[in-house]
Amino acid sequence: MIHPSYVELMKVVNNNVEIGEEPVVNSRYSIVIAAAKRARQIIDGAEPLIAHPKCNKPLSIAVEELYTGAVRIVSDDEDLNEGEEA
């Protein structure tokens, strides 16, 4: 059994969404893509954002970061808005 499960990750990621707002993550595919992108950053030399990861594998670290809230998934719309403010 994989821990945390996709369902658990989706609940954590969508935890701060207000009632009536669009959830950040609608599918398992979104979680997989986010974890893969973060794992690629770690492989390319980015430091883990958690102090003591349970595993040394980049994908496991990325999943743990998502689960603990150390990494946030940003929608394309949010990313564009942040770029305009800068």
Swiss-Prot record:
Keywords: DNA-directed RNA polymerase, Nucleotidyltransferase, Transcription, Transferase. Signal peptide: none annotated. One of its GO terms (molecular function) is DNA-directed RNA polymerase activity. Transmembrane segments: none annotated. The keyword Ion transport does not apply. It comes from the Bacteria. It holds the Pfam family RNA_pol_Rpb6. One of its GO terms (biological process) is DNA-templated transcription. Its EC number is 2.7.7.6. It catalyses: RNA(n) + a ribonucleoside 5'-triphosphate = RNA(n+1) + diphosphate. The keyword Transmembrane helix does not apply. One of its GO terms (cellular component) is DNA-directed RNA polymerase complex. HAMAP family: RNApol_bact_RpoZ. The RNAP catalytic core consists of 2 alpha, 1 beta, 1 beta' and 1 omega subunit. When a sigma factor is associated with the core the holoenzyme is formed, which can initiate transcription. Promotes RNA polymerase assembly. Latches the N- and C-terminal regions of the beta' subunit thereby facilitating its interaction with the beta and alpha subunits. Belongs to the RNA polymerase subunit omega family. This is DNA-directed RNA polymerase subunit omega. It comes from Agathobacter rectalis (strain ATCC 33656 / DSM 3377 / JCM 17463 / KCTC 5835 / VPI 0990) (Eubacterium rectale).
